[in-house]
Amino acid sequence: MNNTPDVNTDRAASDTSLETSSTSEVSVGTDAASAGPALGRTRRPLRNISEVRHFFRTNEVPIYFVGATPFNLLGLDRWVRNFSYVTYYDGWDGAHPRVFSPKHKPYIEFSSGEEINNWLLVNPEVRAHMSRPSPSGQRPKVAMVFFDAETERICDELGYDLILPAAELREHLDSKLVTTRLGDEVGAASVPNVLITVREYQELLDAATAGGLGTDLVVQTAYGDSGKTTFFIDDETGWKRNQRDIIGSEIKVMKRINNRPVAVEAVLTRNGTIVGPFMSELTGHAQLTPYRGGWCGNEMFPEVLTEGLRRRAGDLVVRLGDRLGAEGYRGFFEIDVLVDTDTDEVYLGELNPRISGASAITNVTAGAYADVPLFAFHLLEYFDVPFEFDVDEINARWRELAAEDLWSQMVIKETSSAVQLITEAPLTGQYSYDRSGSLVYRRAALDWHQLQNESEAFFLRIYGAGDYRWKGADLGVLVTKGRLQRRANSEADTLTIRARHLLDSIRNQYTGLPLGSAEVSAARVARAASMAK
């Protein structure tokens, strides 16, 4: 990576700083950053949402979200005092008061999100930033999406509390096969399936026939992003195309159904499982991602599920969440629910035992503003504070509140096979349409919480000037009010006219110098790909 800023980047940083300092964005009424410290912390149990709000608005413990970008939990600092971000990429070029990114970043070929986070934790600039004494003298708490045993060792040595389930447990639960078995134990059934190990196509067919799955099959390996480790096989040609990734390992073979994927996040607390809002998923749109079936965004809208389906899906999430508790898990997780569009059956899809890409929408809902963001319950679970909540009452209220809100996000990946060195990129901030209908940059913004209607959008830049864009690279995330996809008759979801306009408008603001693919190593490509969901 070339970290030398050009003129445009310097100008962007200067303009953003001026805009931030001249608005009330940093200190709006919901922003906990400006709240005063608690005068005396009581240790009696927190029993209602007002007490939870007060607890976090007067929090003195430094909490850091560490990651390639702050995307997943951006805006949580509005509720939680002393919550900030340590990131590899800084879309604000230094102007966000609670985003820290080291200035000196030599080129490194990262192979995973875990490697990025571990590099950040041991970076001297980051250690100096995080070692600043806190008013309370308490150890910093650290959250992130990707971590491993090495992350745990680093945090232990540096004196940080990693407020996440154990890496070993999460790795175990991350298996699609383990999820299927745990779900079956508590009546949270997956799409009709068999779990088998095969070495040839006929074995696959025999097992599918015995399981009543037919010949149009969906095959998944135990680990990996669903967009890259899910294979659609309906004949021997499909088998031969994917057999290298399938042979010799236990796999999940499912009947192919017409389904609508729905995402939901939840938090397993000592009082039970709290279920967040349900969202539809943007998957496999060729304009957004080069990966078939790959996740590329979410939508939350009233009709995402009927009331009956919402209750059944919520019950499925609670049952699986309680089962995870028996495994020793606690805290945040995400579940993909599949709704059979032919029968209205609700199936367990995948478990992501982590903060997910849907978190960005979860924390901005009407339910979050009426109560607190869902992630606040995760924080409580890892704080030394007792609490007693009626989880059933919270879930009932959130079902109603979340069903009335409307938000969408799309993750914009590079879809072209060409490799370019980015020379100009759009600014992070708030955009809107001008009189000619063009999408234009309006002002600096710290997050998307201030968006009011469908004429506005927030763009979070990930790759900027000096970075390479290549097929599959994450360019940025666009968040807006309103829907981004529609279903025409019985066909698959397609992007709306407005979504395509927003997407094209952002893409057109990227310019670059073409490079031959030989000039960019495969390892460099793998490094950037690891930052996907």
Where do the PLM segments sit?
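Short, charged, surface-exposed secondary-structure boundary motifs
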Residues: 96-100, 171-178, 286-288
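ATP-binding N-terminal substructure of ATP-dependent carboxylate-amine bond-forming enzymes
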Residues: 1-168, 201-203, 492-532
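Peripheral (often C-terminal) accessory segments that flank ATP-dependent C-N-forming ligase machineries
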Residues: 380-533
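Phosphate-binding site of ATP-dependent enzymes
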Residues: 231-288, 339-347, 400-417, 422-426, ...
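ATP-dependent carboxylate/phosphate-activation module, predominantly the ATP-grasp catalytic core
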Residues: 255-259, 266-319, 352-379
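A long amphipathic alpha-helix within ATP-dependent nucleotide-binding catalytic cores
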Residues: 294-342, 377-406, 411, 497, ...
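Active-site nucleotide/adenylate-binding loops and adjacent lid/helix of ATP-dependent enzymes
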Residues: 170-252, 257-258, 269-271, 298-322, ...
